[in-house]
Amino acid sequence: METPAGKRRRDSRTVRDYIRTIVDFPHEGILFRDVTTLFADARGFRMAVDQLLAAYAGEDIDKVVGLEARGFILGGAVAHQLSVGFVPIRKKGKLPGAVISQAYALEYGKAVMEIHDDALKPGERVLIVDDLLATGGTAAAGISLCGRLGAEVVGCAFVIELPELGGRALLEGLGHEVHALTAFEGA
Protein backbone atom coordinates (compact mmCIF):
# COMPACT_ATOMS: atom_id res chain seq x y z
CA MET A 1 0.00 0.00 0.00
CA GLU A 2 1.39 3.37 -1.01
CA THR A 3 1.51 6.05 1.66
CA PRO A 4 0.43 9.63 0.94
CA ALA A 5 3.99 10.75 1.71
CA GLY A 6 5.37 8.25 -0.81
CA LYS A 7 2.94 9.44 -3.42
CA ARG A 8 4.00 13.06 -2.84
CA ARG A 9 7.67 12.23 -3.37
CA ARG A 10 6.99 10.76 -6.81
CA ASP A 11 4.72 13.57 -7.99
CA SER A 12 6.83 15.78 -10.24
CA ARG A 13 4.32 18.59 -10.73
CA THR A 14 5.35 22.17 -10.10
CA VAL A 15 3.32 25.11 -8.81
CA ARG A 16 2.85 26.19 -12.42
CA ASP A 17 1.17 22.87 -13.25
CA TYR A 18 -1.64 23.63 -10.80
CA ILE A 19 -2.51 26.99 -12.37
CA ARG A 20 -5.09 26.96 -15.13
CA THR A 21 -5.32 29.47 -17.95
CA ILE A 22 -8.72 30.77 -18.98
CA VAL A 23 -8.81 32.31 -22.46
CA ASP A 24 -10.68 35.58 -23.06
CA PHE A 25 -11.44 36.30 -19.40
CA PRO A 26 -12.44 38.86 -18.24
CA HIS A 27 -12.19 40.33 -21.75
CA GLU A 28 -11.38 39.06 -25.21
CA GLY A 29 -7.64 38.68 -25.77
CA ILE A 30 -6.81 38.16 -22.08
CA LEU A 31 -5.22 34.95 -20.77
CA PHE A 32 -6.40 34.80 -17.16
CA ARG A 33 -4.06 32.86 -14.86
CA ASP A 34 -6.37 31.21 -12.33
CA VAL A 35 -4.79 30.24 -9.00
CA THR A 36 -8.02 28.85 -7.55
CA THR A 37 -7.06 25.45 -8.94
CA LEU A 38 -3.75 25.71 -7.05
CA PHE A 39 -5.57 26.65 -3.83
CA ALA A 40 -8.07 23.80 -4.25
CA ASP A 41 -5.37 21.14 -4.38
CA ALA A 42 -3.86 20.39 -0.97
CA ARG A 43 -0.47 19.42 -2.40
CA GLY A 44 -0.30 22.36 -4.76
CA PHE A 45 -1.32 24.85 -2.08
CA ARG A 46 1.20 23.44 0.40
CA MET A 47 3.90 23.56 -2.29
CA ALA A 48 3.19 27.22 -3.03
CA VAL A 49 3.20 28.23 0.65
CA ASP A 50 6.38 26.23 1.34
CA GLN A 51 8.16 27.85 -1.62
CA LEU A 52 7.10 31.35 -0.55
CA LEU A 53 8.43 30.60 2.94
CA ALA A 54 11.71 29.18 1.61
CA ALA A 55 12.40 32.38 -0.30
CA TYR A 56 12.45 34.32 2.96
CA ALA A 57 14.05 31.75 5.27
CA GLY A 58 16.25 33.50 7.77
CA GLU A 59 14.51 36.86 7.35
CA ASP A 60 13.20 38.48 10.51
CA ILE A 61 9.53 39.06 9.62
CA ASP A 62 7.10 40.58 12.11
CA LYS A 63 3.93 40.56 9.99
CA VAL A 64 2.68 39.36 6.64
CA VAL A 65 0.66 41.85 4.60
CA GLY A 66 -1.79 40.38 2.09
CA LEU A 67 -3.19 42.33 -0.85
CA GLU A 68 -6.87 41.95 -1.68
CA ALA A 69 -8.13 39.42 -2.41
CA ARG A 70 -6.12 36.29 -3.16
CA GLY A 71 -3.20 37.70 -1.20
CA PHE A 72 -5.36 37.08 1.88
CA ILE A 73 -5.40 33.34 1.22
CA LEU A 74 -1.66 33.06 0.62
CA GLY A 75 -0.65 35.67 3.17
CA GLY A 76 -2.74 34.10 5.91
CA ALA A 77 -1.14 30.71 5.30
CA VAL A 78 2.37 32.19 5.22
CA ALA A 79 1.73 34.20 8.41
CA HIS A 80 0.46 31.07 10.15
CA GLN A 81 3.58 29.12 9.20
CA LEU A 82 5.80 31.98 10.40
CA SER A 83 3.76 32.37 13.64
CA VAL A 84 3.33 36.08 12.95
CA GLY A 85 0.33 38.35 12.49
CA PHE A 86 -1.50 38.97 9.23
CA VAL A 87 -2.56 42.41 7.98
CA PRO A 88 -4.96 42.88 5.06
CA ILE A 89 -4.72 45.74 2.58
CA ARG A 90 -8.14 46.17 1.04
CA LYS A 91 -9.95 48.10 -1.63
CA LYS A 92 -11.40 51.44 -0.57
CA GLY A 93 -14.41 51.25 1.72
CA LYS A 94 -13.95 47.63 2.86
CA LEU A 95 -12.19 48.18 6.21
CA PRO A 96 -14.10 49.52 9.23
CA GLY A 97 -12.53 52.13 11.47
CA ALA A 98 -9.70 54.55 10.82
CA VAL A 99 -7.63 53.86 7.71
CA ILE A 100 -5.02 55.46 5.51
CA SER A 101 -5.44 55.33 1.74
CA GLN A 102 -3.23 55.14 -1.32
CA ALA A 103 -4.39 55.75 -4.88
CA TYR A 104 -2.68 53.94 -7.74
CA ALA A 105 -3.03 53.75 -11.50
CA LEU A 106 -4.91 51.06 -13.35
CA GLU A 107 -4.83 50.47 -17.08
CA TYR A 108 -7.86 52.74 -17.44
CA GLY A 109 -8.28 54.94 -14.38
CA LYS A 110 -7.36 54.76 -10.73
CA ALA A 111 -8.07 52.63 -7.70
CA VAL A 112 -7.52 53.09 -3.98
CA MET A 113 -6.18 50.64 -1.39
CA GLU A 114 -6.49 51.05 2.38
CA ILE A 115 -4.95 49.75 5.59
CA HIS A 116 -5.97 50.32 9.20
CA ASP A 117 -3.98 53.23 10.57
CA ASP A 118 -2.83 51.13 13.53
CA ALA A 119 -2.14 47.85 11.68
CA LEU A 120 1.65 48.22 11.67
CA LYS A 121 4.10 49.77 14.09
CA PRO A 122 7.19 51.77 13.15
CA GLY A 123 10.14 49.45 12.60
CA GLU A 124 8.10 46.31 12.00
CA ARG A 125 9.46 44.18 9.18
CA VAL A 126 6.77 42.99 6.80
CA LEU A 127 6.48 40.65 3.84
CA ILE A 128 3.91 41.62 1.20
CA VAL A 129 2.15 38.64 -0.43
CA ASP A 130 -0.19 38.43 -3.41
CA ASP A 131 -1.07 35.89 -6.07
CA LEU A 132 -0.05 37.88 -9.15
CA LEU A 133 2.49 40.53 -10.14
CA ALA A 134 1.47 42.33 -13.33
CA THR A 135 2.13 46.08 -13.56
CA GLY A 136 3.09 46.31 -9.89
CA GLY A 137 0.62 49.09 -9.13
CA THR A 138 -1.22 47.27 -6.36
CA ALA A 139 1.99 46.10 -4.70
CA ALA A 140 3.53 49.59 -4.99
CA ALA A 141 0.45 51.01 -3.25
CA GLY A 142 0.88 48.36 -0.53
CA ILE A 143 4.55 49.27 -0.12
CA SER A 144 3.60 52.93 0.21
CA LEU A 145 0.94 52.21 2.84
CA CYS A 146 3.33 50.08 4.89
CA GLY A 147 6.02 52.75 4.66
CA ARG A 148 3.64 55.49 5.74
CA LEU A 149 3.01 53.52 8.93
CA GLY A 150 6.76 53.22 9.51
CA ALA A 151 7.11 49.54 8.61
CA GLU A 152 10.00 48.14 6.58
CA VAL A 153 9.07 45.96 3.62
CA VAL A 154 11.57 43.06 3.47
CA GLY A 155 10.17 41.67 0.23
CA CYS A 156 7.24 41.16 -2.09
CA ALA A 157 6.26 37.55 -2.82
CA PHE A 158 3.95 36.35 -5.59
CA VAL A 159 2.88 33.03 -7.03
CA ILE A 160 2.71 34.34 -10.62
CA GLU A 161 4.62 37.05 -12.47
CA LEU A 162 3.64 38.44 -15.88
CA PRO A 163 7.11 39.79 -16.83
CA GLU A 164 6.18 41.83 -19.89
CA LEU A 165 3.92 44.07 -17.80
CA GLY A 166 6.89 45.49 -15.89
CA GLY A 167 5.87 44.99 -12.27
CA ARG A 168 9.23 43.60 -11.17
CA ALA A 169 11.09 46.58 -12.61
CA LEU A 170 8.73 48.98 -10.82
CA LEU A 171 9.09 47.31 -7.42
CA GLU A 172 12.84 46.75 -7.72
CA GLY A 173 13.14 50.37 -8.82
CA LEU A 174 11.52 51.28 -5.51
CA GLY A 175 14.26 49.27 -3.78
CA HIS A 176 12.30 46.12 -2.95
CA GLU A 177 13.14 42.47 -3.44
CA VAL A 178 10.67 40.56 -5.62
CA HIS A 179 10.16 36.80 -5.57
CA ALA A 180 7.73 34.96 -7.86
CA LEU A 181 7.23 31.20 -7.97
CA THR A 182 6.54 31.10 -11.71
CA ALA A 183 6.24 33.42 -14.70
CA PHE A 184 3.87 33.35 -17.64
CA GLU A 185 4.57 35.12 -20.91
CA GLY A 186 1.64 36.35 -22.96
CA ALA A 187 -0.44 38.27 -20.47
Curated annotation (Swiss-Prot):
Gene3D superfamilies: 3.40.50.2020. InterPro entries: Ade_phspho_trans, Adenine_PRTase, PRibTrfase_dom, PRTase-like. One of its GO terms (cellular component) is cytoplasm. Pfam families: Pribosyltran. CDD domains: PRTases_typeI. Its EC number is 2.4.2.7. Keywords: Cytoplasm, Glycosyltransferase, Purine salvage, Transferase. The keyword Ion transport does not apply. The keyword Manganese does not apply. GO terms for biological process: adenine salvage; AMP salvage; purine ribonucleoside salvage. GO terms for molecular function: adenine phosphoribosyltransferase activity. It catalyses: AMP + diphosphate = 5-phospho-alpha-D-ribose 1-diphosphate + adenine. It is found in: Cytoplasm. Pathway: Purine metabolism; AMP biosynthesis via salvage pathway; AMP from adenine: step 1/1. It comes from the Bacteria. Homodimer. Catalyzes a salvage reaction resulting in the formation of AMP, that is energically less costly than de novo synthesis. PANTHER family: ADENINE PHOSPHORIBOSYLTRANSFERASE, PHOSPHORIBOSYLTRANSFERASE DOMAIN-CONTAINING PROTEIN. Belongs to the purine/pyrimidine phosphoribosyltransferase family. This is Adenine phosphoribosyltransferase. It comes from Paracoccus denitrificans (strain Pd 1222). The gene is apt.
